Amino acid sequence: MFHFTRILAAFLLPTLCFCGYSTAPSSTVSIDNSLIGEPEVVCETASISLLFKTRNSFNGKVFVKGYVSEPSCMTVGDGKTGHRFEVRHDSCGVRRQREINGVVISATVIISFHSIFITKIDRAYRVSCFYVEGTKKVHNHVDISALTTQLLESETQLPVCRYEILNEAGGSPIKYARIGDQVYHKWTCVAELENVYCMKVHSCTVYDGQGGPPVTVIDANGCSVDGVILQNLEYTSDLTAGKLAPVFKFADKAGLYFNCQIQLTIKDVNYGCSNTQPQCPTSQYVVEPAQKTTETAEPYPYDSHESGYPTRPANYPVASSRYPIPTTQAPASYPSSPAPPPPGADIDNGYPEPQPIYIAETPENAYDGIVGFNDTEQPFTTSAAYTEDGVYSRLIKRNVVESTEQINASNKKRPVTVGDIDLPERGILVFGLEEMEDGETTNAGDHGATRALREARNSQEKTCFSTSRMYFTLILLCLLFATTVVVFIVIVQKQRQILAQTAFFKP
């Protein structure tokens, strides 16, 4: 029994020593410095400053996130404890976000205590300043003949406007989407008074949110710039507009941030909101009419006449008593048209005399071969300029009567603008083509981006669950091993006590 106890002790002693060595805490070296209190943000006219103090001298670096390589966006500590880091509004990718009463300018500043690497004691701060647009009211009064004119003012609340990106018309707002998904852009204004205001959406831009240049999708007139991205808007009411459009994205950028403006005008009593709402062309190409109309004279075909003009050759006989043929003849002249001879002149030059052409006022027109006629044209006379070796061209002057739409357009008044609102921007996160699975289909009630986000979360939850399960199993094995060691130690102690009490060891 004593021999067995010695063997067991010799076997467990290295194991206990190894466990004691492996569980000893490792020594690390950390930077002996930290921030004192919270940094202070100073909003200036053309820049944002961050003031902070450190416990010891600071020799690290302070920079704007994403712009550490630019000298104007990064500074190195000078060994002091008090520091000031300044970022200008027009540099380092500083973001501008329009609000109803002003603009928010923000940037992410990182304070690193190491000159090269980012360590766990470093801090990152989202620095933002809100600049309020100041308003000032000016009052004045006029005294006339000792009578004081009192200024009476009446104020009414302007409509409250908003811009939303929905998964469908009448749907719910979204924050995630995929390339090719259909989203609904909606602009609405809510007014206290009905049938008073009209709205026009204009000057819409989109940018990536990372300092890239904005791209115009709706111009200043409220018309679409690129029909592939966003077509002309549909105004369903006086204060509501929207359009269904496919989702797109910038190259290598996941964010899309839209910014639009809304012009509010007074509704016209006669024409409603037609003066305010944009009249955009349905096509990207505009066909303009020619400034002049020309006519070409050629030998007249007796079989058919398809020129469209109520004219005939000068020598064409008229088989009707309603249109008499003059007996005089015109002198020969080419290429210009001669004036008709005076009445009674007897001139014989071999050329047929020009005949006056009239437009019938009744359907019983003797010109049966003419295809259509224009009742707005005045009677005119053709000349004997039709020759075999020449072409005669002349201008045709028509008295065109303006249409009702043209008259109404000229009588319309310019709408009275009461405000031009810069709406807060709206952004969505777009999943790229490389993140789309092959053969994936989108259900009617399940948005593609929402499903993608849910799948990503499920995968993350599964990974976290597997990691937690592994940790739990490892802890359980350690506890089991420790329990086994304790049991062996207790058994060894009991055996020693039993052996010490036997008579074999007594003197």
Curated annotation (Swiss-Prot):
The residues the entry assigns to the signal sequence are 1-19
Q: What GO CC annotations are associated with the protein?
A: plasma membrane
For this UniProt record, give its keywords in alphabetical order, as a comma-separated list.
Cell membrane, Cuticle, Glycoprotein, Membrane, Signal, Transmembrane, Transmembrane helix
Provide Cytoplasmic-side residue ranges. 493-507
Q: Where is this region: Disordered?
A: 292-350
Q: Which protein, by its recorded name, is this? A: Cuticlin-4
Q: Which residues form the ZP domain?
A: 42-280
The way it spans or sits in the membrane comes to: Single-pass type I membrane protein
Q: PROSITE patterns attached here? A: ZP_2
Deletion phenotype? RNAi-mediated knockdown results in cuticle defects in adults, where the external and internal cuticle under the alae are detached. In addition, alae are present, but they are shallower and often have two or four ridges rather than the three in adult wild-type animals.
The protein's job, in short, is:
Plays a role in alae formation and subsequent cuticle attachment in adults.
> Which InterPro entries does the annotation name?
CUT_N, Cuticlin, ZP_dom
Recorded hits in SMART domains, A to Z, give: ZP (SM00241)
Q: Please give one Pfam family short name.
A: CUT_C
What are the transmembrane regions?
472-492
Q: Which residues are glycosylated?
A: 374, 408
Give the species this sequence originates from: Caenorhabditis elegans
Topology Extracellular: residue spans: 20-471
